[in-house]
């Protein structure tokens, strides 16, 4: 057996360490060089665009990790005061645009309409939603709400025909479900209206998207009940994962949640498989467009199937739209009726407006002329926006027009990788934008107020919500039918509106009311 001399071993180890040290030195020098180059480039960028340092910065006890900031957010979220804290603490005491700096990570918070307009429209391509993908991909497998660039543009183009005016104006589908909703409302009895509204928007949403309703209000199947339960869990879990942020990696097993996600995917896939089979039959001539099964509504599923995209993409888009739509409309209606039950004067005005309609099957044009009801919807969207905050990630070094200099009116630099968060809830309550009564529910303000970038319940720019008119039309139809059926609504819960934030935002205590009608 040959014996390797110690000298040879030492030389071998020495050579190995020399290589390691050399590689580490090269790597370190490269990082230093990159940072120097980046620093110089950003200094030049700021000079070219006239950027000034951010005027307002939230002071942190822990400037490296921001533990104190994170703990405060966790505490006020648990106390259901997160939106209130941003509106009445941060933005009022720090500034309408302020910086939170944790180590090298910068987050800019703003309720400046011009800044938000820049992010969502003027410099749309500078920002994106890549940070959403880890949250939604396990559920949807992709889709319009986690994509950017050409992929997003393609998805948007596929979706647009479904939300065209002629589709939204076809009220037969929605009115059938409103009839079901009305039939489920007990008279002179305390109940939680919010629960019925969740079921209602699930029924309308699934029929609008899939071509077949879950019928959770009147005739649910075992499969639809399991799907609805799984869907509710999924929305809450995705919101919880978003709150965890980087701490997600320290969680234990996620097998239970992934199983529930799969229930949602499997339910949707059943409809996708049927549509794909129909597409194949049409292509082979077994079924023609003339004898293809016809529904009164051309669902998103059928439109996507005809477009030729893959099964996986269809499923992703259907789940994405349902996630975005279900709680948005139900929370809009729930938040509105929470107020109407406390304001009989407003309910009387709504009833006066609809009493000239001698039908419970109105046309789209008749709904559009319910002016005061639309004012009420706008006011609810203003005070209690279903999506109260949002954000974007900077994909390249860019700017915001306001927030820098002594008075905050100079542009500020937004480094690549930074987050810009905007809090619609707080912006909608700015007294300099809406008047001294901005905290009050006053529909009449919309007689003269013209919505602009300071009113963003449905976002703005190229990503403005495709379903905006659908949600408003559906809400108007519910309001009209309720006003025809019920003489009054009485609040049965004295507690004030309290935020419950998941992917959307509603009242944490539900909407406990009692309806009355003429005998």
Curated annotation (Swiss-Prot):
Cellular component, GO annotation: membrane
Family membership noted in the UniProt record: Belongs to the cytochrome P450 family.
Organism expressing this protein natively: Fusarium mangiferae
Keyword entries, A-Z: Heme, Iron, Membrane, Metal-binding, Monooxygenase, Oxidoreductase, Transmembrane, Transmembrane helix
Induction: Expression is induced in the presence of 6mM glutamine.
Keyword Zinc: no
Residue sites binding heme per the record: 465
GO molecular function list: heme binding; iron ion binding; oxidoreductase activity, acting on paired donors, with incorporation or reduction of molecular oxygen, reduced flavin or flavoprotein as one donor, and incorporation of one atom of oxygen
Protein name: Cytochrome P450 monooxygenase FPY7
Membrane association type: Single-pass membrane protein
Membrane-crossing segments per the record: 12-34
Pathway stated in the Swiss-Prot or TrEMBL entry: Secondary metabolite biosynthesis
Location in or out of the cell: Membrane
Role of this protein: Cytochrome P450 monooxygenase; part of the gene cluster that mediates the biosynthesis of the gamma-pyrones fusapyrone (FPY) and deoxyfusapyrone (dFPY). FPY is an undecaketide and thus likely synthesized by the polyketide synthase FPY1 from acetyl-CoA functioning as starter unit and the addition of 10 malonyl-CoA extender units by successive Claisen-condensations.
Entries under Pfam families matching the protein: p450
High-level lineage: Eukaryota, Fungi, Dikarya, Ascomycota, Pezizomycotina
InterPro entries in the cross-refs: Cyt_P450, Cyt_P450_CS, Cyt_P450_E_CYP52_ascomycetes, Cyt_P450_E_CYP52_fungi, Cyt_P450_E_grp-II, Cyt_P450_sf
Gene: FPY7
Catalytic activity, EC: 1.-.-.-
Cofactors: heme
Enzyme class: oxidoreductase
Keyword set includes Glycoprotein: no
